[in-house]
Design a protein with these regions (language model features):
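Conserved beta-strand segments of alpha/beta enzyme cores
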Residues: 20, 51-53, 97
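A structural microfeature
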Residues: 23, 56, 143-144
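Acyl-group handling in specialized metabolite and lipid biosynthesis
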Residues: 197-210
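N-terminal glycine-/serine-/threonine-rich beta1-alpha1-beta2 phosphate-ribose binding loop
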Residues: 31-73
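An anion-binding loop in the catalytic cleft
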Residues: 209-300
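N-terminal Rossmann-like dinucleotide-binding module
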Residues: 1-35
Length: 300
């Protein structure tokens, strides 16, 4: 059970390891882009290439989904970023239970956007957890964790790709221990849990009075959506990448065109250089190229 790119790696590993995948559950097709054409989830796209049966129930709490699962009679249910809550009747169904590939070191960052929030909060270390699923959100006993450093310039999209592969490997190593009864169960420390809520556009506006590192984390943590954003000469632009600039005495938000892009003063007397941006209605491009076509008129 999974939906986005993160889940594809785990499904692919199940297939490569020779497990019989009796069914793939993913979110319903959704309209996308200007044409509002129905688009398959990445998991569905991969499943169809492997001739795997795909199911897309609107709800998991109705009799239809439970009926399908009872007919499939899975020994194990693997969940990776499915996006739907499983009722207790489904959690109790498989012989070996339901396990989840979660992209954080639990109990930190339970919730929908753990990768983004780890970067937004300036974490240096993150990882993946394989856990037993319970009715409470991401609160089940942990079977296995794998930690990794977050790269200094790694954004959420790149980290998602890397953690998806780490999660798939951890899943591959976990399943045999479920079958032979050697899987460990480590209860989570409820006093140490943190929450990673869904992202929304309210997180986008850059407050240049914050430190350069905090803003850099905001930029990297909001890739590919909703993206950090700022105003350049009154025009809204999405910010995709930055570099550390020089110390500055300018007021926060003061902007200067420089060779590598657009230098902006931050609240800690440091500057960040915006190197990649996207103007409203335009394409992502180098900030230096944008400034050649739209010379900076004002500072701040």
């Amino acid at each position: 059970m999974g939906t986005p790119d993160f889940a594809v790696a785990s499904l692919r590993r199940l297939v490569e390891d020779g497990h019989e995948v009796v069914g793939v559950f993913t979110q319903p097709d959704k309209p996308k882009n200007r044409g509002m054409k129905l688009t398959f989830s990445p998991v569905k796209e991969y499943a169809l290439t492997q001739d795997l049966p795909v199911y897309q129930p609107l709800k998991m709490r109705d009799g239809e989904a439970l009926g399908i699962l009872r007919e499939l009679a899975p020994e194990l249910i693997v969940v990776a970023a499915y996006g739907k809550i499983l009722p207790q009747e489904i959690l109790d169904l498989p012989q070996y239970g339901c396990i989840n590939v979660h992209s954080s070191l639990l109990p930190k960052y339970r919730g929908a956007a753990p990768i983004n929030w780890a970067i937004l909060n300036g974490e240096r270390i993150t990882g993946v957890s394989i856990m037993y699923m319970v009715a409470a959100l991401d609160a089940g006993d942990v079977i296995r964790t794998v930690s990794t450093e977050i790269g200094e310039r790694e954004d959420a999209a790149a980290l998602t790709l890397r953690l998806s592969e780490l999660g798939a490997q951890a899943l591959s190593e976990t399943i045999p221990t479920l079958a032979d009864g050697t899987a460990k169960r480590t209860p989570q420390d409820e006093s140490a849990f943190t929450y990673a809520p869904m992202l929304d556009r309210s997180l986008s506006p850059i407050d240049w009075t914050r430190s350069a590192r905090e803003i850099d984390c905001q930029v990297r943590g909001l890739i590919p959506w909703p993206c950090a954003a700022t105003s350049v000469d009154g025009k809204s632009v999405k910010v995709y990448d930055t570099l550390s600039g020089e110390m500055t005495a300018d007021a926060p938000g003061t902007m200067h065109a420089v060779k590598r892009g657009l230098s902006v003063a931050c609240g800690d007397s440091r500057s960040l250089i915006i190197t990649q941006l996207q103007a409203e209605g335009g394409k992502r491009m180098a900030a230096a190229d944008y400034l050649r076509g739209h010379p900076l008129k004002t500072n701040g």
